């Protein structure tokens, strides 16, 4: 096995900084790749939380003026991850999350902030750190999308490049005037460069210039080549279809392990699901639901948004109530959806419970105690909650899109091999019909237990997924040597 060195570039990395699924991937993949002979180091910005955790990091480069202020490149490690940190206080030492202010407004200089990250990634690719010269630079999402562009326009020997799309909806769009401020040539403002409907797009830059493009499920890789799914970039992705592949995400099975999970009331394993009923009782109590073994308890852990289909679930509430089901929802997002769910809970005490926000303990308890987990997304690049549900014996009810299509086996298609229920088209009526079907199956205890056991037997770890990435890296390295 030929060793490979890969520099990953990500704006967030779990367990250091997390706002979404990107962080989970960036935190889990490097560790899983070690078994495949891949040495991965991850470059991330020096946000306040990062600097606190890596207070003993080694300084390996200092700049008196890096994109408008002093900066340093640090090397350190945390929780099994080997890290490079770009410490540029005037860009990253701020309150709020990595992308927005405490009021939820995008930082006005986000273009410069993440161009700086990509610039140093390209420099590491060129040998800035002699002890680690990567074979490949792997950029994650728009925040790292300029790394392949810088490497292209530097016009010198370079490593291979991979661009991963975690969500096409986030494209890093800015005014063209930014080009002059971030050190790219004006020739890059071209339809075959960064130009995007009169502005520039960091995501487009990555898709245009990366040697290989991946996204987080095979179905999503097909969907984003359409005009609708590509959200303005479908034509480019069709043109680059030969470089595009879909590799499913996994989950950290050490964190999501019902046998050792300290967040749940009663631990259990695949061979004995008895304690799931005890967790269900605790979950009902936490969400002020009626205590009942016979009422199917539906769980939801989601951002409340149009993309996630949470408006469709609201329309299906009469079906939930009519079928004698319960609903426990944990999430936040669109203010109107929050208000409507809270109103539904007030109108149906004991049947619908809602907690606005995110709570890690409650998220684990929902997986361990709900009978089914609903993921009704209009589009879903991969999805992680349904993978956790399989791991915990909560039967997924999902829409037929993206990674949901790829990770759940529908009861109507596979019988005894099934792991859940899928519905399409993505409408409230289709969801309601599938909820009725799930309710019927729930009351057939043998059928339901088979669904749970099939889910628990499904490999949702990063083990096989990491092998796919390792094969991609080696294929790219070999093609560049040829």
Curated annotation (Swiss-Prot):
One of its GO terms (molecular function) is alpha-1,4-glucan glucosyltransferase (ADP-glucose donor) activity. The keyword Thylakoid does not apply. Coiled coil: none annotated. One of its GO terms (cellular component) is cytosol. Keywords: Glycogen biosynthesis, Glycosyltransferase, Transferase. Synthesizes alpha-1,4-glucan chains using ADP-glucose. This is Glycogen synthase 2.
């Amino acid at each position: 096995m030929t060793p490979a060195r890969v520099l990953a570039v990500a704006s967030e990395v779990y367990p250091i900084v997390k706002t979404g699924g990107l962080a989970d991937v960036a935190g889990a993949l490097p560790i899983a790749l070690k078994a495949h002979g891949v040495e991965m180091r991850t470059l991330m910005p020096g946000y306040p939380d990062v600097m606190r955790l890596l207070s003993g990091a080694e300084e390996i480069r200092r700049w008196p003026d890096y994109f408008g202020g002093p900066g340093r490149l640090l090397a350190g490690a945390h929780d099994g991850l080997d890290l490079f940190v770009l410490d540029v206080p005037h860009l990253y030492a701020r309150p709020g999350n990595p992308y927005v202010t405490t009021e939820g407004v995008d930082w006005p200089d986000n273009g410069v902030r993440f161009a700086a990250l990509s610039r140093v990634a390209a420099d590491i690719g060129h040998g800035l750190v002699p002890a680690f010269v990567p074979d490949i630079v792997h950029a994650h999402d728009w925040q790292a999308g300029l790394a392949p562009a810088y490497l292209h326009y530097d016009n010198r020997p370079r490593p291979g490049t991979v661009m991963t799309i975690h969500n096409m909806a986030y494209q890093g769009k800015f005014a063209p005037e930014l080009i002059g401020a971030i050190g790219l040539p004006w020739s890059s403002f071209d339809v075959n460069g960064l130009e995007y409907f009169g502005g520039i797009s960091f995501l487009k830059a990555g898709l245009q210039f990366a040697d290989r493009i991946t996204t987080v499920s095979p179905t999503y890789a097909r969907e984003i080549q359409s005009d609708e799914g590509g959200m303005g970039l479908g034509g480019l992705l069709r043109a680059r279809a030969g470089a595009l592949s879909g590799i499913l995400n996994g989950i950290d099975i050490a964190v999501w392990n019902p046998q050792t999970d300290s967040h749940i009331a009663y631990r259990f394993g695949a061979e004995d699901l008895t304690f799931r009923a005890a967790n269900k009782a605790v979950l009902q109590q936490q969400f002020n639901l009626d205590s009942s073994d016979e009422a199917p308890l539906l769980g939801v852990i989601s951002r409340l948004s149009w993309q996630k289909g949470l408006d469709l679930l609201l329309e299906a509430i009469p079906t939930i109530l009519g079928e004698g089901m319960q609903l426990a929802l944990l999430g936040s997002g669109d203010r109107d959806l929050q208000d409507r769910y809270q109103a539904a809970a007030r109108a149906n005490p004991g049947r619908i419970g809602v907690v606005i926000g995110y709570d890690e303990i409650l998220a684990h308890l929902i997986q361990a105690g709900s009978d089914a987990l609903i993921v009704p997304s209009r589009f879903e690049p991969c999805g992680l909650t349904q993978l956790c549900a399989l791991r915990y014996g909560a039967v997924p009810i999902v829409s037929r899109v993206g990674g949901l299509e790829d990770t759940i086996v529908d009861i109507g298609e596979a019988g005894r091999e099934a792991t859940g229920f899928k519905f399409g088209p993505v409408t409230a009526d289709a969801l309601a019909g599938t909820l009725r079907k799930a309710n019927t199956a729930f009351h057939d205890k043998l059928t339901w237990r088979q669904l749970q056991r099939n889910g628990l037997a499904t490999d949702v770890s990063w083990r096989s997924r990491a092998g796919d990435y390792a094969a991609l890296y080696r294929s790219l390295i070999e093609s560049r040597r040829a």
